[in-house]
Amino acid sequence: MKVVSSLKSLKNRDKSCQVVKRRGKIFVINKKNKKFKARQG
């Protein structure tokens, strides 16, 4: 998982990337391609 300060470019890396908020942190997840995973912070 990548940890970045801005998720704007990471959410556009793949069509099936989605932004979710869990436990007060913002994540980018991708159920089809697991390597596109990131957390803001």
Curated annotation (Swiss-Prot):
<protein>
    <recommendedName>
        <fullName>Large ribosomal subunit protein bL36</fullName>
    </recommendedName>
</protein>
<dbReference type="InterPro" id="IPR000473">
    <property type="entry name" value="Ribosomal_bL36"/>
</dbReference>
<dbReference type="GO" id="GO:0003735">
    <property type="term" value="F:structural constituent of ribosome"/>
</dbReference>
<dbReference type="InterPro" id="IPR047621">
    <property type="entry name" value="Ribosomal_L36_bact"/>
</dbReference>
<dbReference type="Pfam" id="PF00444">
    <property type="entry name" value="Ribosomal_L36"/>
</dbReference>
<keyword id="KW-0689">Ribosomal protein</keyword>
<dbReference type="GO" id="GO:0005840">
    <property type="term" value="C:ribosome"/>
</dbReference>
<dbReference type="GO" id="GO:0006412">
    <property type="term" value="P:translation"/>
</dbReference>
<dbReference type="GO" id="GO:1990904">
    <property type="term" value="C:ribonucleoprotein complex"/>
</dbReference>
<comment type="similarity">
    <text>Belongs to the bacterial ribosomal protein bL36 family.</text>
</comment>
<keyword id="KW-0687">Ribonucleoprotein</keyword>
<dbReference type="InterPro" id="IPR035977">
    <property type="entry name" value="Ribosomal_bL36_sp"/>
</dbReference>
